[in-house]
Amino acid sequence: MRLSILILSLLFPFLSVAAQPKHEVRAAWLTALYGLDWPRTRAVSPQSIRKQKEELVDILDKLKAANFNTVLFQTRTRGDVLYPSSIEPFNSILTGKSGGNPGYDPLAFAIEECHKRGMECHAWMVTIPLGNRKHVASLGNRSVTKRMKDICVPYK
């Protein structure tokens, strides 16, 4: 009996069982840069806000139908954001105007809609670059380059 236990205990480490991952990630990046993925409609009225939200819902429905379980939602593009911030302005892709309030929180909406579908939503942030000189100028006084000059270095 002792010999059997000894042999089994010596062989046990060499027996391997292929384990499945606890959670498989099937993710898609959803970009807002230049409206490549979303949004197509500018949020300038109650109707266009509803349309902008419907566009996102449609994308999420298609991702869910394709068996995706994670969305990497772009929340910061080039020095502007897709959520209310006291540091940086709203992205102009939302309303057509840099800093223009779209009338809702796009990130909170994306999270809520992902969760309704049993999907995870991860914030994807582009940290650098802030953009070319023309883009940075379009951000106005709320730009990080204006407010925090000591941390920004122009590319030459």
Q: For each predicted feature, which ranges?
A:
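Active-site-adjacent "subsite" loops/lids of carbohydrate-active enzymes
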Residues: 23, 31, 35-54, 112, ...
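Extracellular/periplasmic catalytic domains that process cell-envelope and extracellular macromolecules
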Residues: 19-24, 64-65, 115-116, 144-145
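Aromatic- and glycine-enriched glycan-recognition loops and surfaces
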Residues: 45-66, 93-117
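A mature extracytoplasmic/lumenal domain signature
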Residues: 32-34, 75-77, 87, 125-127
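Aromatic-lined carbohydrate-binding/catalytic grooves of carbohydrate-active enzymes
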Residues: 66-102
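Bacterial N-terminal signal peptides
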Residues: 4-13
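Hydrophobic faces of well-ordered beta-strands that scaffold small-molecule active sites
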Residues: 26-30, 71-73, 121-123
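N-terminal signal peptide c-region/cleavage motif recognized by signal peptidases
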Residues: 13-14, 22
